Regions:
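Gly/Ser/Thr-rich beta-alpha loop segments that engage phosphate groups in nucleotides
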Residues: 20, 30, 71, 101-107, ...
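A short core secondary-structure module
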Residues: 176-194
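Conserved small/polar residues in nucleotide/adenosyl-binding loops
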Residues: 237-240
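Short glycine/proline- and acidic residue-enriched helix-loop micro-motifs
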Residues: 211-223
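Alpha/beta catalytic cores of group-transfer enzymes, especially the acyltransferase/condensing modules
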Residues: 123-178, 230
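Short, small-residue alpha-helix embedded
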Residues: 106-119
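ATP-binding N-lobe of GHMP and related small-molecule kinases
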Residues: 2-100, 117-118, 122-130, 164, ...
């Protein structure tokens, strides 16, 4: 079989079925407990071998195409570790909403790791790709794993769950961008905070009880986002 010179990879978006923040660690990170699910909304990445270096283009002019993009960081990580002499050109066709909490950047990075592993015949297993992915971002290992999963720690401790019940979903993205840093800095974890029951949600998923799943879904970060961005409440409580 000839050496692969180019590859096209889908980068699937994810949603959080439930998200709780357990505590703030001394190093500033937050420990979370959440259930994540990949969905059939995706970016597409076309990767091609070149003579050398990393080049990147995208259909969205405001996205960086240098080391400030996780796509670039993922490519550089593998090129440095395996001393790859060839270069790579990445064309990113971006369809996942930006700054929407759908892991758009992380899933693109995961797609690059997957694609380069195949193109350059690095022989890395899924688990080995996930180990490298966490160096780029906490969500990257999950975006390599995909499916339905419980995430703990800072999001990198993953437990696979049975597949989610198939159902239609409605994605609503208002014309705002919410800073993750702002949300976590303003999150108050005290006795008055209402936390979603992630353990119960996991059991709902195991039982494939869609009514219970929808009832037990929740996101503790809404205690920050809704007061600061009222449009989110409008979407939550007026959508069909």
């Amino acid at each position: 079989m000839g050496i692969m010179k180019e590859i096209s990879v889908k980068a699937l978006a994810k949603i959080n079925l439930g998200l709780d923040v357990v505590r703030r660690r001394e190093d500033g990170y937050h420990e979370v407990k959440m259930v994540m699910q990949t969905i059939h909304l995706f970016d597409r990445l076309e990767m091609k071998k070149t003579a050398g270096g990393i080049t990147m283009t995208t259909n969205l002019s405001f996205l960086p195409t240098n080391e400030n993009n996780l796509v670039y960081k993922a490519a550089k990580l593998l090129m440095d570790e395996f001393q790859i002499r060839d270069g790579i050109d990445v064309k990113l066709h971006k369809y996942i909403p930006v700054a929407a909490g759908m892991a758009g950047g992380s899933t693109d990075a995961a797609a690059v790791l997957y694609g380069m592993n195949r193109m350059f015949e690095l022989g890395l297993s899924k688990e080995e790709l996930m180990q490298r992915g966490v160096k780029i971002g906490a969500d990257v290992p999950y975006c390599i794993m995909r499916g339905t999963a419980l995430a703990e720690g800072i999001g990198e401790q993953l437990t696979a769950l049975p597949p989610m019940v198939k159902c239609p979903i409605l994605i609503a993205k208002p014309q705002i961008s919410v800073s993750t840093k702002f949300v976590y800095e303003n999150l108050k974890l005290d006795e008055n905070t209402v936390h979603p029951d992630i353990d119960r949600l996991v059991e709902d998923i195991r039982r494939k009880d869609l009514a219970a799943i929808t009832s037990d879904m929740g996101n503790v970060l809404e205690t920050v986002t809704i007061p600061n961005y009222p449009v989110i409440a409008c979407l939550l409580y007026t959508s069909p």
